[in-house]
């Protein structure tokens, strides 16, 4: 378990604020469509596409058959929810 946490700390630490925001939204909402992400992030279409592609290429998020995006790893989601519950916010 500790090795998994260390891995996610490293990955989380290497995400930029745009990517972290998308991951936080998917943690809070389970899955969202591209348009829902566009609305919630207030990013431009090109910016959202850029960071969705980046997170997808890093295997952090996945595109589902129902045309939604979600986190690819349930351990990441569990870790982020735990951090938010314990510390009152997501890791910085």
Kindly give the residue locations of the regions a language model identified:
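Winged-helix-like regulatory helical subdomains adjacent to P-loop NTPase cores
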Residues: 1-43
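Non-catalytic, well-ordered alpha-helical scaffold segments
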Residues: 20, 49, 73-74
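Secondary-structure transition/capping residues
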Residues: 33-34, 48, 62, 87, ...
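Short amphipathic alpha-helical interaction segments
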Residues: 41-58, 63-66
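Short, Lys/Arg-rich nucleic-acid/phosphate-binding segment
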Residues: 64-70, 74-75
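Short, amphipathic alpha-helical interaction segments positioned at domain boundaries
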Residues: 75-92
């Amino acid at each position: 378990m500790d090795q998994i946490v260390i891995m996610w700390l490293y990955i989380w630490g290497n995400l930029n604020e745009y990517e972290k925001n998308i991951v936080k939204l998917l943690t809070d909402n389970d899955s969202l469509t591209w348009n829902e992400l566009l609305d919630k992030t207030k990013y431009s279409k090109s910016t959202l596409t850029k960071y969705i592609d980046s997170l997808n290429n890093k295997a952090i998020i996945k595109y589902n058959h129902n045309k939604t995006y979600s986190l690819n790893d349930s351990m990441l989601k569990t870790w982020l929810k735990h951090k938010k519950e314990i510390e009152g916010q997501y890791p910085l």
